[in-house]
């Protein structure tokens, strides 16, 4: 079975995340092509030489884009940490009456606005395969199966052992890059399960239960 990424899941939404979306869209396409290439090779549709040449091309392009993605993530996380610390300092300065209520509100709005712009940028970058949150378990399962297939069939198809290990290493790195998405999926699923229990014990009315459940299920349809 061919593993598919969710590269067409969601169109770019607004100029604020345009650059981040471009990076992730390119990465998603390359991952998709690379995974399809692996499957074609395992099905006997390519010689080892052609496979290794094209795979290496995708690999180098993915590496360059991933370096850019990780640099952007580090920059945004650093800035968000700085802004959060500024908020805490601002709150303390206001509590001891060093600054007025008006000045506190003005600065807080300014900081909140910047944080509000950085959070969606970071969320986009943390999904390099542009896959729906709800599709994460199936995608992860398919990648794990692909790893097993490469280990088993690669040597049989005359792929050098060092290249087999290289492909497996890259697939494992992709799984590692998905850890934030896995945690998001598990958090949402846990919230849905808790909601069902609250409904069953009578804490929530049927309509309220359905409203909250639909809200959580919509989150599983998002790519960030």
Model-derived regions, located:
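Acidic, Ser/Pro/Thr-rich low-complexity regulatory regions
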Residues: 1-224
């Amino acid at each position: 079975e061919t593993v598919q990424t969710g590269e067409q899941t969601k169109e770019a939404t607004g100029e604020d995340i345009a650059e981040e979306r471009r990076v992730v869209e390119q990465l998603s396409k390359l991952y998709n092509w690379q995974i399809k290439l692996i499957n074609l090779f395992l099905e006997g549709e390519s010689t080892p030489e052609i496979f290794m040449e094209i795979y290496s091309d995708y690999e180098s392009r993915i590496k360059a884009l991933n370096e850019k993605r990780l640099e952007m993530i580090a920059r945004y996380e650093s800035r968000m940490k700085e802004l959060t610390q500024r908020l805490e300092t601002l709150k303390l300065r206001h509590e001891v009456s060093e600054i007025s209520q008006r000045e506190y509100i003005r600065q807080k709005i300014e900081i909140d606005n910047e944080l509000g712009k950085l959070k969606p940028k970071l969320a986009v970058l943390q999904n390099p395969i542009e896959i729906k949150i709800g599709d994460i378990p199936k995608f992860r399962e398919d990648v794990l199966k692909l790893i097993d297939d490469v280990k088993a069939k690669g040597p049989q198809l005359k792929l050098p052992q060092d290249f087999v290990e290289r492909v497996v290493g890259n697939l494992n790195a992709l799984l590692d890059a998905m850890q934030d998405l896995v945690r998001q999926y598990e958090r949402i699923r846990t919230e849905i399960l808790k909601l069902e229990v609250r409904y069953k014990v009578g804490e929530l009315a049927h309509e309220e239960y359905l409203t909250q459940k639909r809200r959580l299920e919509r989150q599983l349809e998002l790519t960030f």
